[in-house]
């Protein structure tokens, strides 16, 4: 059975941090996609300037609070399935789901969790 459901992704995320002297623009692509169970899915997040590895990924389902998947660009949060992985440093980052499961259909966000002067 082919389960094709659009996985909604955040297209543009502008973040402001208290005390930070600059704003770093984060852009995700694709902004939306269609995928099937078992597919390998990759989402890209780009920073306008280098942010080292200060990047986190979150998953959010309708009516639920965001779930923290990955921190420091590639470290898997406790309890998150190993099919999720993150990579990248500097300005380009990726979130990969190696084999999409029905429970993975959701919105995914990247978050730059530290700012630089």
From Swiss-Prot:
Q: Does the keyword Secreted apply?
A: yes
Q: Which UniProt keywords apply?
A: Adaptive immunity, Cell membrane, Disulfide bond, Immunity, Immunoglobulin, Immunoglobulin domain, Membrane, Secreted, Signal
Q: Which residue positions does the secretion signal occupy?
A: 1-22
Q: Where is this region: Complementarity-determining-1?
A: 46-56
InterPro entries with a match to the protein in the record? Ig-like_dom, Ig-like_dom_sf, Ig-like_fold, Ig_sub, Ig_V-set, IgV_Light_Chain
Record region (Framework-3)? 79-110
- Output the GO biological process annotations, alphabetical, semicolon-separated: adaptive immune response; immune response
Pfam families on file? V-set (PF07686)
Report one GO cellular component: extracellular region
Q: Where is this region: Framework-2?
A: 57-71
* Compartment annotation: Secreted; Cell membrane
Q: Which SMART domains match?
A: IG, IGv
Q: Where is this region: Framework-1?
A: 23-45
Main localization, broad class: secreted
The disulfide bridges present are 45-110
The record's region (Complementarity-determining-3) falls at: 111-117
Assembly with partners or alone? Immunoglobulins are composed of two identical heavy chains and two identical light chains; disulfide-linked.
Functional note: V region of the variable domain of immunoglobulin light chains that participates in the antigen recognition. Immunoglobulins, also known as antibodies, are membrane-bound or secreted glycoproteins produced by B lymphocytes. In the recognition phase of humoral immunity, the membrane-bound immunoglobulins serve as receptors which, upon binding of a specific antigen, trigger the clonal expansion and differentiation of B lymphocytes into immunoglobulins-secreting plasma cells.
Name the chain's protein: Immunoglobulin kappa variable 1D-17
Q: Which organism is it from?
A: Homo sapiens
What lineage does UniProt assign to this protein's organism?
A: Eukaryota, Metazoa, Chordata, Craniata, Vertebrata
